[in-house]
Amino acid sequence: MLPNIQLDALLDEAGMSHAGLAVRVNRAGRARGMSLRYEHTAVARWLKGQRPRGQVPDLLCEVLGTRLRRTVTLDDIGLGVPGAPAPVHTTALCGFVERAAALWRSDAQQRPHLRGTAPVTGTPAVLPVWEWENPPEDTDVSRGGSCRVGRADTGTLRAARTHYEQMYRKAGGVATRARIVGFLNSGTAPLLRGSYSDATGRELLRATGGLVAIAGICAYDSDEQGLAQRYFHQALRLAKASGDRALGAYVVALLVNQALFMREYRQAVAFAEAALRTAGRELTPALGSDLHAMQGKAYAYLGDAGSALACIGRAEEAAGRIRPGAEPDETGYVQPGLVNVQVAEALLRLGDLPAARAQAVAAAAAPAHDRGRVHRLAVLARIELRQGDADRGVATAVEMAVQARGMESRRLRDRLRDVRDDLRGTRFGGADEAAALIEGALRVPL
């Protein structure tokens, strides 16, 4: 059951309390000969995703429409499809914008019913990728609104994406998420509701898609997997509307990474293949190398060594074609050594420790931003410890723990825990001290 953020947004816009809405619904029901006795607790259940019974959804439209002085439909209040919210991709662009903005608003206000939202699975998880791949396209994204949107506005959004990406890399997604969601709510949603031509609109949608993707990354890093998935699906819809296939492939790569984390390995393989196929000539070497590497990792977890090694070969070939300065901003995360650490994890899963260590050493030796370096050191430390090289493994673990200081990331904490657990199984003089150092870091609340 997903929270009804659209009803929540309209209730806030109407300036009604939960109790006030319940009273008005009861009153509207009496006018139709119905005896209703709803209280604020019922409204709270509706906001959590429970579908009201009988004619109550129509009464909600009537009450909110009267208060807002405009027609309010079942789709507007998130009740157009019985039992589930309307899918992101099957709505007109204007409706999608309002739904996206409703999520940003609820998230910015830290509404409790959004916390712990589970990711969708099955067809709802796959449908956004399928619809990104296939027609119809958005033929005209122009819009008439109260404020005129220009290139300066889209430039601001691109600069904001870079700013929050750097903040995420240095401080982690937990610390960054509230900041970027607040900007989406206050600085981005008004632009999407503004006035712009088709050409400017596509630039605006592309810039917004890049921002929303970073919001999804921060939610993923905060272990809010359901929210992360919703942001990624939004970013994919924005990429499709912008007409930028490469941006869409980048967003699908984020979904591949999340699928790996959630152990949906077949889905990761399929999503990576969809991105590689659909982006075609627009696929850059950096993104191609990452997609092939993650696909190889998924095959490794599925126990298909032949397919994993074939993907690793394609990843390494694509990585050799990366040219600094020739990639879009979004693929800047594919820095030297990233493919090496992805390959190291795949080889580790396949049990080839010597080859995995060689890749991990190469990854750790390459320059990387703070977050990436912690990831690489964690992988290297685990391989060294598994090979029985306790001296090097402990030293690498200590370096990792020191590097991770100041970062608020639940994903990095997972890696810290893995290394700590490996250290506890090591009989070496400094292993206990290194494990205690990591344990101390894990006690700090996020």
Regions found by a protein language model. Give the residues of each.
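Short amphipathic recognition helices of helix-turn-helix/homeodomain-type DNA-binding modules
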Residues: M1-R24, S35-N134, D414-R417, A436-L446
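Short, well-ordered amphipathic alpha-helices
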Residues: G20-G29, T188
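Short, flexible, glycine-rich and Lys/Arg-enriched loop motifs at helix boundaries
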Residues: A28-L36, H40, R323-T331
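Short acidic, glycine/proline-enriched loop segments that cap or flank alpha-helices
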Residues: A31-M34, Q50-R51, A368-H369, M407
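C-terminal segment of N-terminal export signals and the immediately downstream linker at the start
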Residues: W130-R151
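Conserved binding/catalytic microenvironments
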Residues: G145-L446
